[in-house]
Amino acid sequence: MSLLQVLHYPDERLRKVAKPVVDVNDAIRRIVDDMFETMYAEEGIGLAATQVDIHQRIIVIDVSESRDQRLVMINPELLEKSGETGIDEGCLSIPDQRGFVPRAEKVKVQALDRDGNSFELEADDLLAICIQHEMDHLVGKLFVDYLSPLKRQRIRQKMEKLARMTARAEK
């Protein structure tokens, strides 16, 4: 397994729409394993392949405190959603920034697991929010897109400044 580079906003590659996985094979399983390793190293609870510049419909999630309840969703599709909720969301692609995002309280999704088997999952609370957040990434949508233009611009400026400082430090 290896750590993958997480793209940071406003990198335009985060806006690419992911393509469906055609065949769940060893290469896809390696991507899944690397995504989990990266997500845990970054102390995240979810990661979409788009965030690591892999534009396929793959999501990994683990919202457990014990970090041992891995959820793999390949080619996820939202079947149902209900209720309303929302929290101040963060994102590995937008470090140290948060913003309130309205979400459905409950979702029902269909996806393929790590072995290519189809499953359905009903989720609520943090898991439902995380699934919606990660599925947004697969269509090039970020949590900042739900914020006011002013707040989005402030976050963009902070992220651009961070990128400049990081680039200088690497020279």
Swiss-Prot record:
The active site is at E134. This is Peptide deformylase. The keyword Hydrolase applies. InterPro entries: Peptide_deformylase, Peptide_deformylase_sf. Fe cation binds at C91, H133, H137. The lineage of its organism: Bacteria, Pseudomonadati, Pseudomonadota, Gammaproteobacteria, Enterobacterales. Pfam families: Pep_deformylase. GO terms for biological process: co-translational protein modification; translation. HAMAP family: Pep_deformylase (MF_00163). Keywords: Hydrolase, Iron, Metal-binding, Protein biosynthesis. Its cofactor is Fe(2+). It is an enzyme of class 3 (hydrolase). Its EC number is 3.5.1.88. It comes from the Bacteria. Binds 1 Fe(2+) ion. Removes the formyl group from the N-terminal Met of newly synthesized proteins. Requires at least a dipeptide for an efficient rate of reaction. N-terminal L-methionine is a prerequisite for activity but the enzyme has broad specificity at other positions. The keyword Hydrolase applies. It catalyses: N-terminal N-formyl-L-methionyl-[peptide] + H2O = N-terminal L-methionyl-[peptide] + formate. One of its GO terms (molecular function) is metal ion binding. Belongs to the polypeptide deformylase family.
